[in-house]
């Protein structure tokens, strides 16, 4: 029994120890939580006040004082009531003189001026100019109002310094937004420097443009001085005259390329196988050489440049390029003439006589056609053909170059002396042989097409005549066909 009591006593003691330890732990947890809360509160109190947002900086604390200048009593009372409803402090004045007295009073503290433009004694624009010319009052925003909204008046008020222009009748929502002008003016004058930055930018831009213009003028003057100075300034040893001749040479070459239009056909070859364009090019080469010689006699440095330009290798290169250009022009003429003949084949002939004359002329051209050196592959038709009215301009253009054939002989040009006359005679023969084959094929196709068209038109014409005869045989009244009636039968029926 004693042993059992001892055991039960030990169990009770152990239970007490366990419960006591759990209670101590709970107290410790509560103490730690309180300590952490106290630390957080102390940290929040120790935070600097700079992070706190002050709305007083952005929102107006007090109501704005508005000075209303209006000579009409009813309008003045209405606008005053509207301003008071918008939580403004209003000082209404019927005259400009009284308004100026209030503005000069330091105790008034006017934040905004709302004035009428047209007034009997002193106008609102006079008050505006007077406020803008004052040292301290020019910071007060002035708003003009009027029943006239002409562009001239609005521009005059805004150019004199007005912040806004309101047109009567004035609405309440317009008056609610008047505080924004005061806020902008205070914000700009508080040190943000937005307006001053704009003015600085505007003033800097014209200075930069003037500087660029001055630099451009200085560079132009420097170029002119260098152009007027002697040839010793050039590093290559060439004179200004020599460079001028070289530039004139390149300019003339570009001018000759630009003056020949790509849409026009080149000149037709003459009987001697020379081209007018080639002669003109040769004449230009001669003129350029003469100018080089004249300039070369003037100065020693010019002589060096002219000698370089008159080297035989350069002349041979130029001659080769000119001959190649002439060959290309000849190829273009052949291709274009083939295109023109195809276009001409589509032109319809209206009468049988024209068709017959065309056939006769085509047969004659087959038999009597002579292919000469340098001739253009163009269909030769008589004046009675349908193509005569299209070829008048071409024939007149051909006659003009043939008058000056002798002046453009190949023996006069230095290019012909260097290259010989073989280059100008061999190429047209090859081109003409290929053009003759094309011409024969084209002529056969034209004949076939015209015969088919003739048969088709004849069938249509026969059909038309037969139907016309049948229609004439049928009598009709007012466009409607009727049956024939015998006069004898109708007379017997009447009796």
From Swiss-Prot:
Residues 65-183 form the Response regulatory domain. Residues 231-248 have a biased composition (Low complexity). Residues 442-484 form the CCT domain. Phosphorylated by WNK1; during the night. Phosphorylation is required for optimal interaction with APRR1/TOC1. Keywords: Biological rhythms, Coiled coil, Nucleus, Phosphoprotein, Transcription, Transcription regulation, Two-component regulatory system. Changing residue 210 to E: In strain: cv. Cvi-0 and cv. Landsberg erecta. Gene3D superfamilies: 3.40.50.2300. Induction: Expressed with a circadian rhythm showing a peak in the evening. Residues 206-217, 256-265, 294-304, 335-350, 380-395, 420-436 have a biased composition (Polar residues). It holds the Pfam family Response_reg. It is found in: Nucleus. Belongs to the ARR-like family. This is Two-component response regulator-like APRR3.
């Amino acid at each position: 029994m004693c042993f059992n009591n001892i055991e039960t006593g030990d169990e009770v003691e152990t239970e007490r120890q366990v419960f006591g330890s759990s209670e101590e732990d709970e107290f410790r947890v509560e103490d730690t939580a309180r300590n952490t809360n106290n630390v957080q509160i102390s940290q929040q109190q120790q935070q600097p006040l700079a992070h706190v947002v002050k709305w007083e900086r952005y929102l107006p604390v007090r109501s704005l004082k508005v000075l209303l200048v209006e000579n009409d009593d009813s309008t003045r009372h209405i606008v005053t009531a509207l301003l008071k409803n918008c939580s403004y402090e209003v000082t209404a004045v019927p005259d400009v003189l009284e308004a100026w007295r209030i503005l000069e009073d330091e105790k008034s503290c006017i934040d905004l001026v709302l004035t009428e433009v047209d007034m009997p004694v002193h106008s609102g624009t006079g008050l505006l100019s007077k406020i803008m010319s004052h040292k301290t009052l020019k910071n007060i925003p002035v708003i003009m109002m009027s029943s006239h909204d002409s562009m001239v008046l609005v521009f005059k008020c805004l150019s004199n310094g007005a912040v806004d222009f309101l047109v009567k009748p004035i609405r309440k929502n317009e008056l609610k937004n008047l505080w924004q002008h005061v806020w902008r003016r205070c914000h700009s004058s508080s040190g943000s420097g937005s307006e001053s930055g704009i003015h600085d930018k505007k003033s800097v831009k014209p200075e930069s443009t003037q500087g660029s213009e001055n630099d451009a003028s200085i560079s132009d003057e420097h170029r002119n001085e260098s152009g007027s100075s002697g040839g010793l300034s050039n590093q290559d040893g060439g004179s200004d005259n020599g460079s001028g001749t070289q530039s004139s040479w390149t300019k003339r070459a570009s001018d000759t390329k630009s003056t020949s239009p790509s849409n026009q056909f080149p000149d037709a070859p003459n009987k001697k196988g020379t081209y007018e364009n080639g002669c003109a090019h040769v004449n230009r080469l001669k003129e350029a050489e003469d100018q080089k010689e004249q300039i070369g006699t003037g100065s020693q440095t010019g002589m060096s440049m002219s000698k370089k330009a008159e080297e035989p290798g350069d002349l041979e290169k130029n001659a080769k390029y000119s001959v190649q250009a002439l060959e290309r022009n000849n190829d273009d003429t052949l291709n274009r003439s083939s295109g023109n003949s195809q276009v001409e084949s589509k032109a319809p002939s209206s009468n049988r006589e024209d068709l017959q004359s065309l056939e006769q002329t085509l047969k004659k051209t087959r038999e009597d056609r002579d292919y000469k050196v340098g001739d253009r592959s163009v269909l030769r038709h008589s004046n009675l053909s349908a193509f005569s009215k299209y070829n008048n301009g071409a024939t007149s253009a051909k006659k003009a170059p043939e008058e000056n054939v002798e002046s453009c002989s190949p023996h006069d040009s230095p290019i012909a002396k260097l290259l010989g006359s073989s280059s100008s005679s061999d190429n047209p023969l090859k081109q003409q042989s290929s053009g003759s084959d094309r011409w024969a094929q084209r002529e056969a196709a034209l004949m076939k097409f015209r015969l088919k068209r003739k048969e088709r038109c004849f069938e249509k014409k026969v059909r038309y005549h037969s139907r016309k005869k049948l229609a004439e045989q049928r009598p009709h009244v007012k466009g409607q066909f009727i049956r024939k009636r015998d006069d004898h039968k109708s007379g017997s029926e009447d009796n």
